[in-house]
Amino acid sequence: MSLLTEVETYVLSIIPSGPLKAEIAQRLEDVFAGKNTDLEALMEWLKTRPILSPLTKGILGFVFTLTVPSERGLQRRRFVQNALNGNGDPNNMDRAVKLYRKLKREITFHGAKEIALSYSAGALASCMGLIYNRMGAVTTEVVLGLVCATCEQIADSQHRSHRQMVTTTNPLIRHENRMVLASTTAKAMEQMAGSSEQAAEAMEVASQARQMVQAMRVIGTHPSSSAGLKNDLLENLQAYQKRMGVQMQRFK
């Protein structure tokens, strides 16, 4: 796996699934391939994205600044600086300074990542803030190692939270989660179906599923009534893809 592929993997792991994630993935690919060289426009686009947390925007802005060629004197962006200040916690800043000194002596991506993983996400974000404001004091490989370590810390906590929700025994939460998944699956089906004549059937199935979820929420239904709803939709999607000559077996 190449270094930039690894960085892209870690960065995308902290972004919530949805159309915006697909859009960000495309921007990252373009940046890493050297196709997008307008840093100013890229940062303005990032700043106005909905849904993303300030920290996620800060990390993405940091990665873009690091990888898009730009003039040395380019103004640092306030939304990135604010996100990477460790919540203003002096403890985070103290640890960040210690980590920064260690990273200045490191030269490899994996070495930097190993060192960084022993610090909290707050300290790591603060360290990124230090580097963002004094770009150039640490090698690019080392900085990318720091980025990946930060994303791993964040993804770990997100995974724990997600696992708690998935394994909850509360039937109401499980019911709502199944309906949300069914609704987002239906939306994805509509987007994938496109405008061809053969797509009408898939669009109809997706539309009916969304109407069903809406009705279930309006009238209130038994928590078990949503069981299997998402899988039924995925089976319909796979059947549609098979007729279109596309074989995708990895959705479930």
From Swiss-Prot:
Molecular function GO labels: RNA binding; structural constituent of virion
Top-level taxon: Viruses
InterPro entries membership: Flu_matrix_M1 (IPR036039), Flu_matrix_M1_C (IPR013188), Flu_matrix_M1_N (IPR001561), Flu_matrix_M1_N_sub1 (IPR015423), Flu_matrix_M1_N_sub2 (IPR015799), INFV_M1 (IPR037533)
SMART domains: Flu_M1_C
Membrane-binding as annotated region, ranges: 1-164
Listed Gene3D superfamilies: 1.10.10.180, 1.20.91.10
Keywords of this entry: Host nucleus, Membrane, RNA-binding, Viral matrix protein, Virion
Localization, UniProt: Virion membrane; Host nucleus
Coiled-coil segments on the chain, per record: none
Chief subcellular location: virion
Example of a GO biological process term: viral budding from plasma membrane
Residue numbers covered by motif Nuclear localization signal: 101-105
Membrane topology: Peripheral membrane protein
One CC-aspect GO term: virion membrane
Region (RNP-binding): 165-252
Stated family: Belongs to the influenza viruses Matrix protein M1 family.
Known partners and oligomeric status: Homodimer and homomultimer. Interacts with NEP. Binds ribonucleocapsid by both interacting with genomic RNA and NP protein. May interact with HA and NA. Cannot bind NP without genomic RNA.
Role summary: Plays critical roles in virus replication, from virus entry and uncoating to assembly and budding of the virus particle. M1 binding to ribonucleocapsids (RNPs) in nucleus seems to inhibit viral transcription. Interaction of viral NEP with M1-RNP is thought to promote nuclear export of the complex, which is targeted to the virion assembly site at the apical plasma membrane in polarized epithelial cells. Interactions with NA and HA may bring M1, a non-raft-associated protein, into lipid rafts. Forms a continuous shell on the inner side of the lipid bilayer in virion, where it binds the RNP.
Remaining remarks: Most abundant protein in virion. When expressed alone can form virus-like particles in transfected cells.
Name of the protein described by the UniProt record: Matrix protein 1
